[in-house]
């Protein structure tokens, strides 16, 4: 029906006859000559409907309105002098229309396509209109290229694409499951998979050796800008491997994905232990596009005359005192900014934000009076302070200090405009703890309970580490993986440490324990969040910009009005009756 997409055309096509299809983006009547901006998925081109060229086409054009569907034929000509539009890919040319057809009319649209001021909820309600925006289309074109590149890259490395079940058994993986009632087995439920984790391990037990899948996953959790109830991941598993083998495979297909998206990245990525990431950056996914690394000064504060700081410094296992040096910060930050910094960290549990300024005549600030001159010199040397600098201090319980100082580090970087938006800083964070303590004192697996521990016989659960690894890009966790437990006795021991008794093990994981009893090979893998990856590549503000039909932050689809009530008949067939107070 068409000869070209709009942006396929340029100055080299002048004089050529074309046939184009698309929507009216806008129209203007200039003294009898009608100009129409025709939009297709690639972008916009200008149509010129002049009665001197075609009276019939001009008459039809006079009836066109925004979002009408047009089919047009005409000839490419260069725009007149001074009329070139550098904002358009086709800004040097226009189409002189000889034939025009209104293929379909449109109701008055609730907003102009590509109007960035439109409320997001309105855009999501009319998502089919929102997706007509060529900028959004470019996101999905890039997503398609990324998926094709991932498939080709993994296939070239000997991986087999295998689909795993969507209707499966509920297993504890950290978030709530979406449950699906069974009509045939009333009172029983399937769960939608939070990941293909157990099935891909079973495929390794089956001898498939190398598996991948671009998998849809489901988690019923609180939503944020980078979370959705259903999301997609590039899921990979391989047998007879070590951590370094999985990392090499992941770097290979990530490099191929970025190349397909027009970006070159360097491999291998740098690596950092989890402990170092937390102690130096206050995050297990540090953004390395800028410095502002923590400086450990707790030993110096043991000599302080300030009772609060001195008491904190006595317990180096439970407490931390960290410093962040900002070069020339004393010459940059106003008194009001310093107040804002303290207000910011207080939101995350800080009792305050101490600081020292470096003046020409020495160190200044309320803290200075609590140190001897020798200790101040040691502090200055440790922090490599220079005239004009300011150094901030966070002190208190380890978890709280690392958290708010990590957040403050990012806040400072944004204030100082230190972040290069075009930089791509990849990082592997390795050697994660096997377990983490919950607020109630119990322990849970930091990644998942199928991760291979390094020192399972250690009596202190917090000292057990795991063969787990996360890949981070610009401070965002792209994905994570681990070497898995492939021996039945070790898996049962991990379950026991998590207070999962033998009866629960058999009920929830009996099939996995059976598989591990029949000669399971060493295996490991990784999963990369496709939505987050494309969000970072495109520079989108939210993964909702790279998912065709996303949910809101309340897990609703405003376009289809899902979720919605089921009919009484459907509920009867499923054997389900709602409580009376459920609306």
UniProtKB/Swiss-Prot annotation:
GO terms for cellular component: cytoplasm. ATP binds at residues 219-221, 228, 477, 529-532. One of its GO terms (biological process) is aspartyl-tRNA aminoacylation. Aspartyl-tRNA synthetase with relaxed tRNA specificity since it is able to aspartylate not only its cognate tRNA(Asp) but also tRNA(Asn). Reaction proceeds in two steps: L-aspartate is first activated by ATP to form Asp-AMP and then transferred to the acceptor end of tRNA(Asp/Asn). Its EC number is 6.1.1.23. This is Aspartate--tRNA(Asp/Asn) ligase. The record marks 30, 82 as: Important for tRNA non-discrimination. Residues 197-200 are annotated as: Aspartate. One of its GO terms (molecular function) is aspartate-tRNA(Asn) ligase activity. Disulfide bonds: none annotated. Homodimer. It comes from Campylobacter jejuni subsp. jejuni serotype O:2 (strain ATCC 700819 / NCTC 11168). The keyword Cytoplasm applies. InterPro entries: Aa-tRNA-synt_II (IPR004364), aa-tRNA-synth_II (IPR006195), aa-tRNA-synth_II/BPL/LPL (IPR045864), Asp-tRNA-ligase_1 (IPR004524), Asp-tRNA-ligase_1_N (IPR047089), Asp/Asn-tRNA-synth_IIb (IPR002312), AspRS_core (IPR047090), GAD-like_sf (IPR004115). L-aspartate binds at residues 173, 219, 447, 484. It is found in: Cytoplasm. It is an enzyme of class 6 (ligase). Keywords: Aminoacyl-tRNA synthetase, ATP-binding, Cytoplasm, Ligase, Nucleotide-binding, Protein biosynthesis. It holds the Pfam family tRNA-synt_2. Belongs to the class-II aminoacyl-tRNA synthetase family. Type 1 subfamily.
């Amino acid at each position: 029906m068409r000869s070209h997409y709009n942006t396929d055309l340029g100055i080299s096509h002048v004089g050529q006859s074309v046939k184009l299809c698309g929507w009216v983006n806008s129209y203007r009547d200039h003294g009898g000559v009608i100009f129409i901006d025709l939009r297709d998925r690639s972008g916009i081109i200008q149509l010129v409907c002049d009665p001197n060229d075609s009276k019939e086409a001009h008459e039809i054009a006079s009836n066109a309105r925004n979002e009408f569907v047009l089919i047009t034929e005409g000839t490419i000509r260069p725009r007149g002098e001074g009329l070139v539009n550098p904002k358009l890919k086709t800004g040097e040319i226009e189409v002189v229309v000889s034939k025009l057809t209104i293929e379909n009319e449109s109701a008055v649209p609730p907003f102009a396509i590509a109007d960035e001021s439109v409320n997001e909820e309105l855009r999501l309600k009319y998502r089919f209109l929102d997706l007509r925006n060529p900028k959004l289309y470019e996101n999905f074109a890039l997503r398609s290229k990324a998926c094709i590149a991932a498939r080709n890259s993994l296939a070239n490395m000997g991986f087999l694409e295998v689909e795993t079940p969507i209707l499966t058994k509920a297993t504890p993986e950290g978030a709530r499951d979406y449950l699906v009632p069974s009509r045939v087995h009333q009172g029983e439920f399937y769960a939608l998979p939070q990941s293909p984790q157990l099935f891909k391990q079973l495929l390794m037990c089956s001898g498939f050796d190398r598996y991948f899948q671009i998998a849809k996953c489901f988690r019923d959790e609180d939503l944020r800008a980078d979370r959705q109830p259903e999301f997609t991941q590039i899921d990979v598993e391989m047998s007879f491997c070590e951590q370094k083998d999985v990392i090499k495979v992941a770097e290979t297909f990530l490099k191929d994905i970025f190349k397909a998206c027009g970006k070159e990245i360097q491999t291998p990525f740098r690596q950092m232990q989890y402990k170092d990431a937390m102690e130096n950056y206050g995050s297990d996914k540090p953004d390395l596009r800028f410095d502002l690394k923590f400086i450990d000064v707790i030993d110096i504060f043991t000599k302080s005359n300030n009772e609060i700081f001195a008491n904190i410094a006595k317990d180096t296992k439970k407490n931390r005192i960290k410093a962040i040096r900002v070069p020339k910060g004393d010459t940059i930050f106003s008194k009001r900014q310093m107040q804002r910094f303290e207000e910011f960290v207080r939101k995350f549990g800080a009792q305050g934000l101490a600081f020292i300024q470096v003046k020409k005549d020495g160190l200044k600030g309320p803290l200075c009076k609590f140190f001897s001159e020798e200790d101040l010199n040691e502090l200055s040397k440790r922090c490599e302070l220079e005239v004009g600098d300011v150094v901030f201090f966070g002190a208190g319980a380890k978890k709280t200090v690392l958290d708010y100082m990590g957040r403050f580090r990012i806040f400072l970087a944004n204030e100082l405009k230190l972040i290069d938006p075009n930089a791509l800083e990849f990082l592997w964070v390795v050697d994660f703890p096997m377990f983490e303590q919950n607020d109630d004192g119990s322990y849970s697996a930091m990644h998942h309970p199928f991760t291979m521990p390094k020192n399972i016989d250690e009596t202190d659960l917090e000292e057990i580490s795991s063969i787990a690894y996360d890949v981070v890009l610009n401070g965002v966790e792209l994905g994570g993986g681990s070497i898995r437990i492939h021996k039945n006795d070790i898996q049962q021991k991990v379950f026991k440490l998590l207070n999962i008794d033998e009866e629960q093990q058999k009920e929830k994981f009996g099939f996995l324990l059976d598989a591990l009893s029949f000669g399971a090979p060493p295996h490991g893998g990784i999963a990369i969040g496709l939505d987050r990856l494309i969000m970072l590549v495109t520079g989108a503000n939210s993964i909702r910009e790279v998912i065709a039909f996303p949910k809101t932050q309340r897990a609703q689809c405003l376009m289809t009005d899902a979720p919605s009530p089921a009919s009484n008949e459907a509920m009867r067939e499923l054997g389900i009756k709602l409580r009376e107070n459920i609306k």
